């Protein structure tokens, strides 16, 4: 099956000679130098632990997941790290769905050896309960387009996905202290993986019996080259892994030359990955700030409830303070308006006669005479002037009152009481007419 699929696409003799002749002149088909790297682009998805890497025409997507499992008996305090690759039929005519072929298995082994044997990921931090529960991290790599040098692109996709992955926080509790509680993302912030260094893979292609070496071979160059070697190094120059498939031998000097090239390139590639990851984390933190007010309802412990209650109290106090500030501002505005209106009235006042009348229009002259007589004041001829209906037309009302007239009227009233009407004095019997009770 592998032989049949491998023979589906071949370069012609003229194409092969053209590529080899160009390499002898230190030229490549895509215009690069022998040790130049193609353009690297890294993107991230909305979920934690998803990455998309494009190296020239090569397109690889990585996704990281984790689950709680029982640890291995020989390593009860360490988690596990596994890598799985999947070749899409759209990426290359030689790929077909189903069971992974030799190329897929080899790709997974190279990346796994560079990550796990170099101890790049701290597996001891993945332990939750020694001997019973640890985190198992799984990396899935999907080949979307094969433009050559799948190992380097897949390795960068795996590293980018691991650096942006977050696992749920968990605690050990319960009655016996052996119960593992996984906290949701809304309740507690997820935790990143502890990565000590970034092992970067670099692939070299050999031509003309190992006399010509190129870095980052393309799909066409891979069909012509007689051998290849993958070197995994970090930014410090430490060699993490070396993989050389094929039967073609290579001199020791060529291998050392490849190691020097990989070490010089590792720092630049590591810088690109870290910058992209930092930019993604900053964007993610901004989105997280907007998402925090809408927390999902969940049953939480006492300290968490207390924190929520304090948060509610502080929010209520802030609202009350805002309302009081609004009321104070409204009162200030109203007082300012009143002051301005009074100032305008005072400014517009020009002075003039008052229209105020101390007496009402329907004044009775007889009642006025009686009231003056009751006071006992000597009454003489007087005149009072009043203004009717607020107009300037004044009417003089002369009132002549004498003591005799007032006493005459009072005498008339007394005679009326004596003649016909009964008074309170008449109702009381004198002492002479009262009957003795004895």
UniProtKB/Swiss-Prot annotation:
Subcellular location(s) of the protein: Cytoplasm; Nucleus
Biased composition (Polar residues): 380-394
The name this protein goes by in its record: Exosome complex component RRP45B
Gene assigned in the entry: RRP45B
GO CC annotations on file: cytoplasm; cytosol; exosome (RNase complex); nucleus
Molecular functions (GO terms): 3'-5'-RNA exonuclease activity; RNA binding
Record note on disruption phenotype: Bright green glossy stems and siliques due to reduced cuticular wax accumulation.
GO terms for biological process, alphabetical: RNA processing
Region called Disordered, residue ranges: 293-322, 334-438
């Amino acid at each position: 099956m592998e032989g049949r699929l491998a023979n589906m696409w071949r370069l012609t003799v003229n194409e092969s000679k053209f590529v080899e002749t160009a390499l002898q002149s230190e030229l490549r088909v895509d215009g690069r130098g022998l040790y130049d790297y193609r353009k690297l682009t890294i993107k991230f998805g909305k979920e934690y632990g998803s990455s998309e890497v494009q190296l020239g025409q090569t397109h690889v997507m990585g996704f990281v997941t984790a689950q709680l499992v029982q640890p291995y008996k020989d390593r009860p305090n360490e988690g596990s790290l596994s890598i799985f690759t999947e070749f899409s039929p759209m990426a290359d005519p030689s790929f077909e769905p189903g069971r992974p072929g030799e190329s897929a298995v080899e790709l997974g082994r190279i990346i796994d050896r560079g990550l796990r044997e170099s101890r790049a990921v701290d597996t001891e931090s993945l332990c939750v309960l020694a001997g019973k529960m640890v985190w198992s991290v799984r990396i899935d790599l999907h080949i979307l387009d094969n433009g050559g040098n799948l190992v380097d692109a897949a390795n960068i996709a795996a590293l980018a996905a691991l650096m942006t992955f977050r696992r749920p926080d968990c605690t050990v509790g319960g009655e016996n202290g052996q119960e593992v509680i996984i906290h949701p993302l809304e309740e507690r912030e997820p935790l990143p993986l502890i990565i000590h260094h970034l092992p970067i893979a670099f692939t070299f292609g050999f031509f003309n019996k190992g006399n010509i070496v190129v870095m980052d071979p393309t799909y066409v160059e891979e069909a012509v080259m007689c051998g290849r070697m993958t070197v995994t190094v970090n930014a410090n120059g430490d060699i993490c892994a070396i993989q050389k498939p094929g039967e073609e031998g290579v001199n020791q000097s060529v291998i050392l030359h490849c190691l020097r090239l990989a070490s010089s390139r590792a720092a630049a590639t590591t810088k690109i990955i870290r910058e992209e990851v930092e930019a993604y984390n900053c964007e993610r933190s901004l989105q997280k700030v907007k998402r925090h007010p809408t927390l999902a309802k969940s049953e939480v412990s006492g300290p968490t409830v207390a924190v929520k209650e304090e948060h509610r109290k502080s929010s209520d106090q802030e609202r009350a303070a805002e309302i009081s500030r609004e009321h104070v501002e409204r009162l200030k505005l109203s007082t300012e308006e009143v002051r301005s209106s009074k100032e305008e009235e005072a400014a517009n006042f020009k002075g003039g006669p008052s229209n105020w009348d101390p007496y009402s229009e329907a004044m009775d002259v007889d009642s006025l005479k009686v009231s003056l007589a009751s006071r006992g004041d000597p009454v003489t001829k007087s005149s009072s002037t009043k203004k009717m209906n607020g107009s300037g037309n004044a009417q003089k009302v002369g009132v002549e009152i004498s003591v005799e007239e007032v006493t005459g009227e009072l005498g008339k009233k007394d005679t009326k009481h004596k003649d016909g009407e009964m008074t309170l004095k008449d109702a009381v019997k004198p002492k002479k007419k009262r009957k003795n009770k004895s």
